[in-house]
Amino acid sequence: SCYRAGGNTCYASAPEAVNREHCLFEGNRCVAVTPSDPAPALVALEASMVIRNSRGERVVAAEDFFMKPSVDITRMTVLEPDDLLTTIRIPNTWAGADFYFEKAADRGSWDFPMVNVAAALRVEGGRILAASIVAGAVQCTPRRLGEVEALVTGRDRNDETAELAGALAIRGAEPLNYN
Protein backbone atom coordinates (compact mmCIF):
# COMPACT_ATOMS: atom_id res chain seq x y z
CA SER A 1 0.00 0.00 0.00
CA CYS A 2 1.02 3.65 -0.29
CA TYR A 3 3.22 5.50 2.21
CA ARG A 4 0.28 7.55 3.55
CA ALA A 5 -1.53 4.31 4.40
CA GLY A 6 1.53 2.96 6.23
CA GLY A 7 2.91 1.01 3.26
CA ASN A 8 6.22 1.27 1.46
CA THR A 9 5.25 2.32 -2.08
CA CYS A 10 4.36 5.55 -3.84
CA TYR A 11 2.11 4.55 -6.70
CA ALA A 12 1.88 8.14 -7.95
CA SER A 13 5.62 8.50 -8.53
CA ALA A 14 6.06 5.22 -10.42
CA PRO A 15 7.11 5.74 -14.08
CA GLU A 16 3.79 4.37 -15.37
CA ALA A 17 1.64 6.36 -12.90
CA VAL A 18 -0.98 8.85 -14.04
CA ASN A 19 0.11 11.54 -11.59
CA ARG A 20 -1.56 14.63 -12.96
CA GLU A 21 -2.83 15.85 -9.59
CA HIS A 22 0.32 15.43 -7.52
CA CYS A 23 3.22 17.51 -6.16
CA LEU A 24 5.03 20.07 -8.24
CA PHE A 25 7.10 21.23 -5.25
CA GLU A 26 8.75 19.52 -2.29
CA GLY A 27 7.97 16.02 -3.52
CA ASN A 28 9.72 13.31 -1.57
CA ARG A 29 8.62 9.78 -0.73
CA CYS A 30 5.01 10.98 -0.90
CA VAL A 31 3.78 13.20 -3.73
CA ALA A 32 0.22 13.69 -2.48
CA VAL A 33 -1.04 17.27 -2.33
CA THR A 34 -3.49 19.02 -0.03
CA PRO A 35 -6.48 19.11 -2.42
CA SER A 36 -8.44 21.58 -0.30
CA ASP A 37 -10.00 24.75 -1.69
CA PRO A 38 -10.39 26.51 1.67
CA ALA A 39 -6.83 25.67 2.84
CA PRO A 40 -4.92 28.29 0.80
CA ALA A 41 -7.55 30.92 1.63
CA LEU A 42 -7.26 30.19 5.35
CA VAL A 43 -3.47 30.41 5.21
CA ALA A 44 -3.57 33.62 3.14
CA LEU A 45 -5.96 35.23 5.64
CA GLU A 46 -3.77 34.12 8.59
CA ALA A 47 -6.54 32.05 10.14
CA SER A 48 -6.07 29.99 13.27
CA MET A 49 -7.60 26.64 14.08
CA VAL A 50 -9.06 25.91 17.51
CA ILE A 51 -8.63 22.23 18.38
CA ARG A 52 -10.20 20.50 21.39
CA ASN A 53 -9.76 17.12 22.98
CA SER A 54 -10.29 15.58 26.42
CA ARG A 55 -7.13 17.30 27.69
CA GLY A 56 -8.17 20.81 26.67
CA GLU A 57 -7.88 23.25 23.83
CA ARG A 58 -5.05 24.48 21.64
CA VAL A 59 -4.81 27.01 18.83
CA VAL A 60 -2.73 26.35 15.72
CA ALA A 61 -2.02 28.78 12.88
CA ALA A 62 -3.55 27.58 9.59
CA GLU A 63 -0.06 27.62 8.08
CA ASP A 64 1.07 25.08 10.72
CA PHE A 65 -2.13 22.98 10.66
CA PHE A 66 -1.18 21.02 7.54
CA MET A 67 1.58 18.47 8.07
CA LYS A 68 4.42 17.56 5.73
CA PRO A 69 5.13 13.86 5.12
CA SER A 70 8.64 14.42 6.51
CA VAL A 71 7.02 14.99 9.92
CA ASP A 72 4.55 12.09 9.78
CA ILE A 73 3.85 10.46 6.45
CA THR A 74 0.54 8.94 7.62
CA ARG A 75 -1.09 12.28 8.56
CA MET A 76 -2.00 15.37 6.57
CA THR A 77 -2.84 17.63 9.54
CA VAL A 78 -1.72 18.07 13.14
CA LEU A 79 -4.99 16.57 14.38
CA GLU A 80 -4.48 13.65 16.74
CA PRO A 81 -7.00 10.75 16.85
CA ASP A 82 -8.98 12.32 19.73
CA ASP A 83 -8.87 15.92 18.41
CA LEU A 84 -11.80 17.87 17.06
CA LEU A 85 -11.46 21.06 15.05
CA THR A 86 -14.09 23.25 16.71
CA THR A 87 -13.49 26.75 15.37
CA ILE A 88 -11.68 28.53 12.58
CA ARG A 89 -10.78 32.11 13.49
CA ILE A 90 -10.07 34.61 10.74
CA PRO A 91 -8.54 37.81 12.13
CA ASN A 92 -9.37 41.20 10.67
CA THR A 93 -5.76 41.64 9.50
CA TRP A 94 -6.89 41.74 5.87
CA ALA A 95 -10.20 43.55 6.44
CA GLY A 96 -10.79 45.98 3.60
CA ALA A 97 -8.24 44.27 1.37
CA ASP A 98 -9.00 42.82 -2.04
CA PHE A 99 -9.34 39.04 -1.89
CA TYR A 100 -8.97 36.77 -4.88
CA PHE A 101 -9.45 33.02 -5.25
CA GLU A 102 -9.03 31.05 -8.46
CA LYS A 103 -9.24 27.32 -9.06
CA ALA A 104 -8.33 25.27 -12.11
CA ALA A 105 -9.97 21.84 -12.26
CA ASP A 106 -10.90 19.39 -14.98
CA ARG A 107 -14.59 19.00 -14.20
CA GLY A 108 -15.70 22.15 -12.47
CA SER A 109 -15.94 23.54 -8.96
CA TRP A 110 -16.81 20.19 -7.34
CA ASP A 111 -13.60 18.50 -8.57
CA PHE A 112 -10.22 18.39 -6.84
CA PRO A 113 -8.10 21.31 -8.04
CA MET A 114 -5.18 20.98 -10.42
CA VAL A 115 -4.08 24.18 -8.71
CA ASN A 116 -5.77 26.94 -6.77
CA VAL A 117 -4.53 30.26 -5.47
CA ALA A 118 -5.74 32.64 -2.80
CA ALA A 119 -4.48 36.19 -2.51
CA ALA A 120 -5.20 39.07 -0.18
CA LEU A 121 -3.92 42.39 -1.50
CA ARG A 122 -3.90 45.78 0.12
CA VAL A 123 -3.94 48.22 -2.80
CA GLU A 124 -3.91 52.01 -2.77
CA GLY A 125 -3.91 54.13 -5.90
CA GLY A 126 -3.21 51.09 -8.05
CA ARG A 127 -0.07 50.17 -6.08
CA ILE A 128 0.16 46.95 -4.03
CA LEU A 129 1.07 47.88 -0.45
CA ALA A 130 0.91 44.36 1.04
CA ALA A 131 0.22 40.87 -0.24
CA SER A 132 -0.52 37.42 1.13
CA ILE A 133 -0.49 34.79 -1.63
CA VAL A 134 -0.89 31.03 -1.19
CA ALA A 135 -1.15 28.24 -3.78
CA GLY A 136 -2.94 24.97 -3.14
CA ALA A 137 -2.73 21.49 -4.69
CA VAL A 138 0.91 21.95 -5.71
CA GLN A 139 2.62 20.33 -2.71
CA CYS A 140 1.72 18.43 0.45
CA THR A 141 0.77 21.62 2.31
CA PRO A 142 -0.61 24.95 1.10
CA ARG A 143 2.36 26.76 -0.47
CA ARG A 144 2.93 30.29 0.79
CA LEU A 145 4.47 32.29 -2.05
CA GLY A 146 6.69 34.55 0.04
CA GLU A 147 9.01 35.48 -2.83
CA VAL A 148 6.00 36.42 -4.94
CA GLU A 149 4.56 38.49 -2.08
CA ALA A 150 7.87 40.37 -1.82
CA LEU A 151 8.02 40.88 -5.59
CA VAL A 152 4.54 42.38 -5.96
CA THR A 153 4.68 44.57 -2.85
CA GLY A 154 5.39 48.14 -3.93
CA ARG A 155 4.55 47.47 -7.60
CA ASP A 156 1.61 48.61 -9.64
CA ARG A 157 -1.29 46.18 -9.85
CA ASN A 158 -1.19 45.44 -13.57
CA ASP A 159 -0.59 42.73 -16.17
CA GLU A 160 3.20 43.15 -16.05
CA THR A 161 3.27 42.53 -12.29
CA ALA A 162 0.95 39.54 -12.73
CA GLU A 163 3.24 38.04 -15.41
CA LEU A 164 6.32 38.47 -13.20
CA ALA A 165 4.47 36.98 -10.23
CA GLY A 166 3.31 33.98 -12.26
CA ALA A 167 6.80 33.26 -13.56
CA LEU A 168 8.27 33.44 -10.06
CA ALA A 169 5.48 31.30 -8.57
CA ILE A 170 6.38 28.32 -10.78
CA ARG A 171 10.15 28.64 -10.47
CA GLY A 172 11.57 25.46 -8.98
CA ALA A 173 8.59 23.30 -9.94
CA GLU A 174 9.50 19.68 -10.59
CA PRO A 175 6.61 18.21 -12.56
CA LEU A 176 5.96 14.49 -12.63
CA ASN A 177 5.16 12.67 -15.89
CA TYR A 178 1.66 14.09 -16.37
CA ASN A 179 1.44 17.39 -14.54
Q: In which residue ranges do the predicted regions lie?
A:
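C-terminal structural segment of proteins
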Residues: 1-179
